[in-house]
């Protein structure tokens, strides 16, 4: 009996009925377990979500999406055998791998986001607790014009950290009221001034979310831990999962002794970035955001700065 052989058509490689380029074609919400090894420390285990894209030329109906999964899995296997690794380098390697697999594409993009658990101790009693920080990384690879085997890779690393802010405006109103009340009770002016310097006045608070991302060329590394520290210390106070009464006193007092507008937080982050990363190239792209969830309003307060590192250095060091 003679067997028939069928050649399955490559539908993706056929020509589309409407011949236009597509900027991004790929997969989103791809869940992967990522283990990042660290020097002399326990590895970080992350449940990560990936978005993976390539561009598509006008003469091709579709992309080979299975290659996206192959590219991610191959790089994740490589990570397991590497002693030290960064999540932005993971995205960079995946983007590079994608262009190698999608010969028809000129650029590839990878986005990754995870929840990163960090250990914290409460400020007074030292109770250990875990805090969640949202971290994210991105990478883009562009094929060279004259050399198809050359890929220009850019990578981005960032974090979003929750903290606390205290409103300076309402605090000044309450400070003025306290001064007037004390004066009516017969307290002398010098005593009132000393009292107000030692005891912070009431104000309304916000739960703030500070966000920093730094985009650099593939051969520069940016410390994620440094980004997290910068965001934390740029608000009025850190927040903690577990607090005893003495801890609450420290947190509330710290925040109200250090009141900040949403704009102050962004400027503080910018200043700390310049101080923390003296070797970062001038063409690094810095994005800083602060979102404060108001307690006495229905709206949120927002501030942002997007700049090159060189621009921030010039403004802050002038």
Curated annotation (Swiss-Prot):
Query: What cofactors does this protein use?
Result: Fe(2+)
Mind telling me which Gene3D superfamilies this protein's record contains?
Urate Oxidase
Q: Give its E.C. classification number.
A: 3.5.4.39
The UniProt entry, under InterPro entries, shows: GTP_cyclohydrolase_FolE2/MptA (IPR003801), GTP_cyclohydrolase_MptA (IPR022840)
Catalysed reaction per UniProt? GTP + H2O = 7,8-dihydroneopterin 2',3'-cyclic phosphate + formate + diphosphate + H(+)
Q: Name one GO molecular function term.
A: iron ion binding
Give the record's pathway: Cofactor biosynthesis; 5,6,7,8-tetrahydromethanopterin biosynthesis
Q: What keyword terms does UniProt attach to this protein?
A: Hydrolase, Iron, Metal-binding
In the record, biological process GO terms are: tetrahydromethanopterin biosynthetic process
How cofactor binds (record note)? Binds 1 Fe(2+) ion per subunit.
* Protein's job: Converts GTP to 7,8-dihydro-D-neopterin 2',3'-cyclic phosphate, the first intermediate in the biosynthesis of coenzyme methanopterin.
Tell me the subunit arrangement. Homodimer.
- Say which family it is in: Belongs to the GTP cyclohydrolase IV family.
- Name the UniProt record assigns to this protein: GTP cyclohydrolase MptA
- Species of the source: Methanosarcina acetivorans (strain ATCC 35395 / DSM 2834 / JCM 12185 / C2A)
Cite the source lineage. Answer: Archaea, Methanobacteriati, Methanobacteriota, Stenosarchaea group, Methanomicrobia
User: Gene encoding this chain?
Assistant: mptA
């Amino acid at each position: 009996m003679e067997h028939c052989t069928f050649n399955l058509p490559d539908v993706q490689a056929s020509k589309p009925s409407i011949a236009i380029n597509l900027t991004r074609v790929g997969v989103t919400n791809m869940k992967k377990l990522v283990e990042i090894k660290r020097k002399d420390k326990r590895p970080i285990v992350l449940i990560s979500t990936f978005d993976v894209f390539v561009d598509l030329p006008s003469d091709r109906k579709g992309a080979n999406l299975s290659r996206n999964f192959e590219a991610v899995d191959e790089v994740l296997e490589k990570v397991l055998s590497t002693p030290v690794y960064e999540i932005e380098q993971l995205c960079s390697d995946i983007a590079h791998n994608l262009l190698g697999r999608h010969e028809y594409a000129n650029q590839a993009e990878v986005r990754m986001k995870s929840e990163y658990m960090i250990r914290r101790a409460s400020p007074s009693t030292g109770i250990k607790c875990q805090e969640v920080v949202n971290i994210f990384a991105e990478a883009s690879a562009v094929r060279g014009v004259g050399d198809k085997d050359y890929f220009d890779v850019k990578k981005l690393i960032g974090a979003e950290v929750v903290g606390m802010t205290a409103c300076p405006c309402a605090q000044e109103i309450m400070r003025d009221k306290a001064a007037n009340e004390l004066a009516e009770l017969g307290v002398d002016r010098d005593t009132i001034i000393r009292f107000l310097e030692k005891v912070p006045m009431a104000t309304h608070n916000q739960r703030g979310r500070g966000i920093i991302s730094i985009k650099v060329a593939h051969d520069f590394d940016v410390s994620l831990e440094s980004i997290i520290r910068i965001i934390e210390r740029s608000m009025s106070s850190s927040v903690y999962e577990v607090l005893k009464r003495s801890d609450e006193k420290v947190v509330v007092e710290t925040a109200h002794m250090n009141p900040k507008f949403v704009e102050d937080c962004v400027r503080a982050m910018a200043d700390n970035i310049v101080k923390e990363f003296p070797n970062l190239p001038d063409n690094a792209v810095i994005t800083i955001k602060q979102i404060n969830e108001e307690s006495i309003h229905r709206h949120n307060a927002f501030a942002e700065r997007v700049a090159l590192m060189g621009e921030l250095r010039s403004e802050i060091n002038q």
